[in-house]
Curated annotation (Swiss-Prot):
Region (Disordered): 79-113
Organism the protein comes from: Oryza sativa subsp. japonica (Rice)
Designated name of the protein: Neutral/alkaline invertase 1, mitochondrial
Domain of life: Eukaryota
Subcellular location: Mitochondrion
Record-annotated membrane-spanning stretches: none
Tissue spec: Expressed in roots, leaf and stems.
Top EC class for this record: hydrolase
Gene3D superfamilies: 1.50.10.10
Family (UniProt): Belongs to the glycosyl hydrolase 100 family.
Length: 628
């Protein structure tokens, strides 16, 4: 099937594909066996509608996507006659228009489309589970958490648009930027609101942050890419036309020009796309995704991510501090967290991009990148006992097209702690991979989101959860979950962090324990049929969170102390706990965030079109690893 002829999950006829996807969605329950979709044939059809293969007439590069210099959709969304937050006007029929002919009485009613009916049933099922969440009995801790989450809501022009990062009364005079609405911080709050059936605040957030995407942003006279989403925004009141008695509210975004280190938030746009899909799936409001300004926003984000550069790998090249770990921690290059979110955002965008002549090249670029990225991460980032032993025996300085040690990794890079730490059964995706460098630290968010998005294979996903279970005292201990393990210490800490006083060993981003990761751990456990692990982690967190006043993070190797600079009443700690509880009680709702494996995606290798003796694809040699 030619790549240009692919249908994606959009309205009209392609809506059948969306319904097929719904039918193929995993039904979650307490048993892992219940996670298998019953309609395998329908699921396969949906995957075919969602994936591309390269026909023989395509170029070896798959007609690589080139971001347009001028986007007419962009111009339309910014025109004064069509403000970004207004839906396109609906053309009314003229008075003299001929009305449609009435159906003759006695004729049988047209048959209902079974696929569309199934799609509607799926949506009704999700809404029924939302009602179940709303009616469930809440514990004392949950009631307190909802009260605190409600107090954190930020309003703009009379409508709720987000939640502040923290609402700690003890630091009222030293708020820094904790009184702002962060995109990444709001995601667990948005999930909590959606699971509770309160979607308006999420819709407002999506649209207002979309408006901010078009703002001019400069740092020392230099402007980053047009599609960059802000890290955060703040609602400010300013005098109206110099009148000290009249004020108007404005949104003041921060694109990184005020952040510590002046780093652009690479993950903001990725989270925005993931949240947009979740909102549509649980509310059924797909009209939001179809708006011209929203479609333009998606394309601009993808333009930044899919632009050609000097990199030889399908992974995104970013600088230190461009994601949740927003301080210098040695993650510059191709950090796993960004790659997992990137893969998930591409999967979500592929469902939402409108299919037309102007989007064919973009859709091809998405599919090629998904195919290459999944292979790259699964093949080169995965380590278990067998892989570590293989690296231990690597030969170096191999100059050939069929080298085994492709990245010239020196066996001496294997840290001394790893051989004794990694269990016999289990493994994980390493934190980073570059020429002559592997970061063997375990990063929780990247590994968990690799499970959620199906970036990791089924076997790898099981191995990651097996490792967490085997190393419970290291990763969970007294408070879930370690943001990374182990911490940088001694000379390594001084060199890599620059002697950062906030990232001392086993504190903050350097091995601190972050309760907000609980909701992502719960999602991963639900997907893999391991709700028992999520329940254990939630029980550990419940013992302390309310009593400790909902801290941002915990310190020490086992997470016993509240972080030395931790804010209390941290919103994403509160929201992460609430989302975890609701997801665990109604695991069917996890489908709004989870992406199932698409096996046909693995066949979309661009280099299969024009192979030569000089360029050989590594996929055949690694096929068993990828498809497991």
């Amino acid at each position: 099937m030619a790549a240009a002829a692919i249908s994606h999950l959009r309205r009209g006829a392609p809506r059948h594909a969306r319904a097929l996807l719904y039918l193929s969605t995993r039904r979650f329950s307490s048993s892992s066996a219940a996670g298998v979709a019953p309609l395998a044939a329908v699921a396969a059809s949906a995957r075919r509608l969602l994936s591309t293969s390269v026909d023989s007439g395509a170029s070896s590069t798959g007609e690589s996507y080139k971001p347009p210099l001028f986007d007419p959709f962009r111009a339309a969304s910014l025109a004064s006659s069509a403000p970004p937050l207004e839906s396109p006007p609906i053309e009314e029929l003229p008075d003299d228009a001929t009305p449609p002919p009435e159906e003759e009485p006695g004729l049988p009613a047209p048959e209902k489309d079974p696929v569309a009916t199934a799609c509607q049933h799926e949506l009704e099922g999700l809404k029924a589970w939302v009602e179940t969440v709303r009616s469930r009995k809440e514990s004392t801790e949950e009631k307190e958490a909802w009260s605190l989450l409600g107090r954190s809501v930020v309003s703009y022009c009379g409508t709720a648009v987000g939640t502040v990062a923290a609402n700690d009364p003890s630091t009222a005079n030293q708020m820094l930027n904790y009184d702002q609405v962060f995109i990444r911080d709001f995601v667990p709050s948005a999930i909590a609101f959606l699971l509770k059936g309160e979607g308006d605040i999420v819709k407002n957030f999506l649209l207002h942050t979309l408006q901010l995407q078009s703002w001019e942003k400069t740092v020392d006279c230099y402007s980053p890419g047009q599609g960059l989403m802000p890290a955060s925004f703040k609602v400010r009141s300013i005098p109206l036309d110099g009148n000290s008695e009249a004020f108007e509210e404005v949104l003041d975004p921060d694109f990184g020009e005020s952040a510590i280190g002046r780093v652009a938030p690479v993950d903001s746009g990725l989270w925005w796309i993931i949240l947009l899909r979740a909102y549509g799936k649980i509310t059924g409001d797909y009209a939001l995704q179809e708006r011209v300004d929203v479609q333009t926003g998606i394309r601009l984000i993808l333009n930044l991510c899919l632009s050609d550069g000097f990199d030889m790998f399908p992974t995104l090249l970013v600088t230190d501090g461009s994601c949740m770990i927003d301080r210098r921690m040695g993650i510059h290059g191709h950090p796993l967290e960004i790659q997992s979110l990137f893969y998930s955002a591409l999967r979500c965008a592929r469902e939402m991009v409108s299919v037309n002549d102007g989007s064919n090249s973009l859709i091809r670029a998405i599919n090629y990148r998904l195919s290459a990225l999944s292979f790259h991460i699964r093949e080169y980032y995965w380590v278990d006992m067998k892989k570590i032993n293989e690296i231990y025996r690597y030969k170096t300085e191999e100059y050939s097209h069929d080298a085994i040690n492709k990245f010239n990794i020196y066996p001496e890079q294997i840290p001394s702690w790893l051989a004794d730490w990694i269990p016999e059964k289990g493994g994980y995706l390493i934190g980073n991979l570059q020429p002559a460098h592997m970061d063997f630290r375990f990063f929780s968010l990247g590994n968990l989101w690799a499970i959620i998005s199906s970036l990791a294979t089924q076997r790898q996903a099981e191995g990651i959860l097996n490792l967490i279970e085997a190393k419970w005292e290291d990763i969970i201990a007294n408070m879930p979950l370690k943001i990374c393990y182990p911490a940088l210490e001694y000379e390594e800490w001084r060199i890599i962090t620059g002697s950062d006083p906030k990232n001392t060993p086993w504190s903050y981003h350097n091995g601190g324990s972050w309760p907000t990761l609980l909701w992502q751990f719960t999602l991963a456990c639900i997907k893999m049929g391991r709700r028992d692990l999520a329940q254990r982690a939630i029980e550990v967190a419940e013992k302390r969170l309310s009593e400790d006043k909902w801290p941002e993070y915990y310190d020490t190797r086992t997470g016993r102390f509240i972080g030395k600079q931790s804010r209390l009443y941290q919103t994403w700690t509160i929201a992460g706990y609430l989302s975890s509880k609701m997801l665990l009680d109604c695991p069917e709702l996890a489908s709004i965030l989870i992406c199932e494996e698409d096996l046909e995606l693995l066949e979309g290798c661009a280099c299969s079109v024009n192979k030569s003796a000089r360029t050989k694809c590594s996929r055949r040699a690694a096929r068993s690893q990828v498809l497991v």
